[in-house]
Curated annotation (Swiss-Prot):
One of its GO terms (cellular component) is nucleolus. This is LSM complex subunit LSM3. It is found in: Nucleus; Nucleus, Nucleolus; Cytoplasm. SMART domains: Sm. Disulfide bonds: none annotated. Pfam families: LSM (PF01423). Changing residue 36 to A: Strongly reduces affinity for poly-U RNA ends. Component of the heptameric LSM1-LSM7 complex that forms a seven-membered ring structure with a donut shape. The LSm subunits are arranged in the order LSM1, LSM2, LSM3, LSM6, LSM5, LSM7 and LSM4. Except for LSM1, where a C-terminal helix crosses the ring structure to form additional interactions with LSM3 and LSM6, each subunit interacts only with its two neighboring subunits. The LSM1-LSM7 complex interacts with PAT1; within the complex PAT1 has direct interactions with LSM2 and LSM3. The LSM1-LSM7 complex interacts with XRN1. The gene is LSM3. Present with 7060 molecules/cell in log phase SD medium. Changing residue 21 to E: Sensitive to thermal stress. Decreases binding affinity for U6 snRNA.
Length: 89
């Protein structure tokens, strides 16, 4: 392994967990990526966290295919075995 992107190559066609700026996360199957860390996921679940009046709420949506701009990505990992898209923050 020579670069961090080599880790992504190992996870092509595998489920990945991606944390984005703006209190958003995605779990989906990694289909493609480039050197700017732009990512394409299929069968993705996006979770958006919002803090309203000191109460944390989350909304979820499913996407058949989604493109993620690389400059919004803060973390990429494999999801835990019981991960259904929801994570604790």
């Amino acid at each position: 392994m020579e670069t961090p992107l080599d880790l992504l190559k190992l996870n092509l066609d595998e489920r990945v967990y991606i944390k984005l700026r703006g209190a958003r996360t995605l779990v989906g199957t990694l289909q493609a990526f480039d050197s700017h860390c732009n990512i394409v996921l299929s069968d993705a679940v996006e979770t958006i966290y919002q803090l309203n009046n000191e109460e944390l709420s989350e909304s979820e949506r499913r996407c058949e295919m989604v493109f993620i701009r690389g400059d919004t990505v803060t973390l990429i990992s494999t999801p835990s075995e019981d991960d259904d898209g929801a994570v604790e923050i």
